[in-house]
Swiss-Prot record:
Organism listed in the record: Acinetobacter baumannii (strain ACICU)
Protein name per Swiss-Prot or TrEMBL: Succinylglutamate desuccinylase
Free-text comment on the cofactor: Binds 1 zinc ion per subunit.
Gene3D superfamilies assigned: Zn peptidases
Enzyme Commission code: 3.5.1.96
Length: 324
């Protein structure tokens, strides 16, 4: 098996599309899609995805390195694994996305958009993940880690978002995120069209979207900054004990509301460079627009993913409250 990332960036296929290593078999399922199945019995089926936004390169490089050490025999695979490089079309152009945000296309969201390379890719990703889980052992617990980096700075640099779900959240997933030294966990309060919502909703996978720092071009990442999550991912796929957390207790937030841009004249009371987890207190105005201002009713809230430049009708930010 040649370099997973290089093949994907070049739009090429490996010389052979399947093969066997010392302790697992593998299949190239298509561009940026690699399935690995241990020869021994396994009790977890794990999806690791990166590059759903094409310019978020550090997680892509982490998955590429993971693939390298697995194929070199330096790490023993103990779970059934699907490696996903989400949006090769945007990766090659160094863009977050080319036409529309792929991470808002899942759960059939692509059907409501014009047919583009990216909408077709979302459909392929849904079908590939569905087949992967359906062909895995019926006894295997299902997991999905979707790795991202952010387009803005953050007062809490690394965090995970859990999709809204009615079934209980998985303790092993939470433990792995704590062990990865993430700063915060954020629980969504409504259904969405993200990749992790798709896997959670349709396959009851324990799913999380991880935000792991700042987006930089390929080759400019200091991967030592991602050592904790890299170690945890390797321990998850090799079924080794998780490392001990080195940071203070992880902070926990709940999404309490979404800021929806309803009018063209929409202004947020944040600077363009304001970091994630910027705060507002009771009575302060977060956003103004003719159809009505957003005034804080709680004692304190935090803002995540503020973006006043979204299209009308879309979410311009998340409003969070902290769970004590």
């Amino acid at each position: 098996m040649q370099d997973f990332l290089a093949l994907t960036l070049q739009g090429e296929q490996p010389a052979t599309r399947e093969g066997k290593q010392a302790n697992f078999s593998w299949r190239w399922l298509g561009e940026g899609l690699l399935e690995c199945t241990p020869h021994a019995q396994y009790d977890k089926a794990v999806v690791l995805s990166a590059g759903v936004h094409g310019n978020e390169t550090a997680p892509i490089e982490l998955l590429s390195h993971l693939c390298t050490v697995l194929f070199a025999g330096r790490l023993k695979l103990a779970v059934r694994l699907l490696l996903v490089l989400g949006n090769p079309y945007a990766m090659r152009q160094g863009k977050r996305y080319v036409h529309d945000d792929v991470n808002r296309m899942f759960c059939g969201g692509y059907k409501n958009l014009p047919v583009t390379e990216e909408s077709k890719r979302a459909e392929v990703l849904e079908q590939t993940v569905a087949t992967f889980f359906q062909e895995s052992s019926s006894q295997a617990k299902r997991y999905h880690y979707d790795l991202h980096t952010a387009i803005r700075a953050s007062l809490l640099p690394t965090f995970a978002l859990f999709p809204y779900q009615t079934h209980s959240y998985d303790a092993d997933l939470t433990a792995s995120l704590e062990a990865a030294d993430l700063d915060a966990l954020v629980y969504h309060n409504a259904v969405g069209k993200t990749f992790t919502h798709f896997t959670s909703e349709n396959f009851k996978a324990a799913s999380a979207t991880l935000e792991l720092g700042k987006a930089l071009p390929f080759g400019q990442n200091d991967l030592s900054q991602f050592a904790s999550i890299d170690e945890v991912i390797r321990n998850v796929v090799s079924e080794q004990a998780l490392p001990v957390r080195n940071k203070p207790k992880i902070r926990v937030f709940q999404v309490s509301d979404s800021l929806i841009k309803r009018d063209e004249e929409f202004h947020m009371n944040l600077s363009a460079e304001a970091p994630n987890f910027s705060t507002f207190t009771k009575g302060e105005i977060i956003a103004t627009q003719p159809s009505g201002n957003y005034v804080v009713e709680q004692d304190q809230v935090w803002i995540l993913f503020p973006n006043p430049n979204v299209k009308i009708g879309l979410r311009a930010g998340l409003v969070l409250t902290e769970t004590i």
